[in-house]
C-alpha cells in the first residue's frame, strides 16, 4: 500500500499549517498581552491631531461607480492573461471568443461613458425658476392658475 501524499494533499497540508499558524499567533497574543483599556486608547488616531467630526462620512456615489468599472476591467485582464499564454495552441476559435469577450466589455464601457458615469463634473440641468406662490396653490389642491403680480 502506498502512503505518499498526493499533490492535493500537499496543498491541503500547506493550508492547514497556515491556518493553524495564524490562529495560534492570534490566540497566543490574546493570552500574553496586557489588557488595560482606557479612553485614550479607544480614540481614533489621525496623524497626531484631535479627531474632528464623525468618522462616518457619506462618499459620493461616483467613487463607487468608478471603482466598480475599474474592478470589472481588472477582472477582464485576469481572464485575458491565461488566454494569451495558450493562444497558439487554441487557434482561431480562441481569438474569436476573446474578441467577443472584449467587445462585450467595450460596449459596457461605452454605455457607462454615454450615460455620463465617467464624467466627474456632471452638468447641472437648467431648471426654470417658478415663484413660490405657484407651489402653494399646487400643494393646497387648488388647480386654478394664479396670475403673477407685476412689481413696478
Curated annotation (Swiss-Prot):
Species in which this protein is naturally found: Chloroherpeton thalassium (strain ATCC 35110 / GB-78)
Listed EC numbers: 7.1.1.-
Record function comment: NDH-1 shuttles electrons from NADH, via FMN and iron-sulfur (Fe-S) centers, to quinones in the respiratory chain. The immediate electron acceptor for the enzyme in this species is believed to be a menaquinone. Couples the redox reaction to proton translocation (for every two electrons transferred, four hydrogen ions are translocated across the cytoplasmic membrane), and thus conserves the redox energy in a proton gradient.
Protein name, per record: NADH-quinone oxidoreductase subunit A 2
Entry-linked HAMAP family: NDH1_NuoA
Gene: nuoA2
UniProt-listed Pfam families: Oxidored_q4
Transmembrane spans: 8-28, 63-83, 90-110
Domain of life per record: Bacteria
Protein location: Cell inner membrane
InterPro entries linked: NAD(P)H_OxRDtase_bac/plastid, NADH_UbQ/plastoQ_OxRdtase_su3, NDAH_ubi_oxred_su3_sf
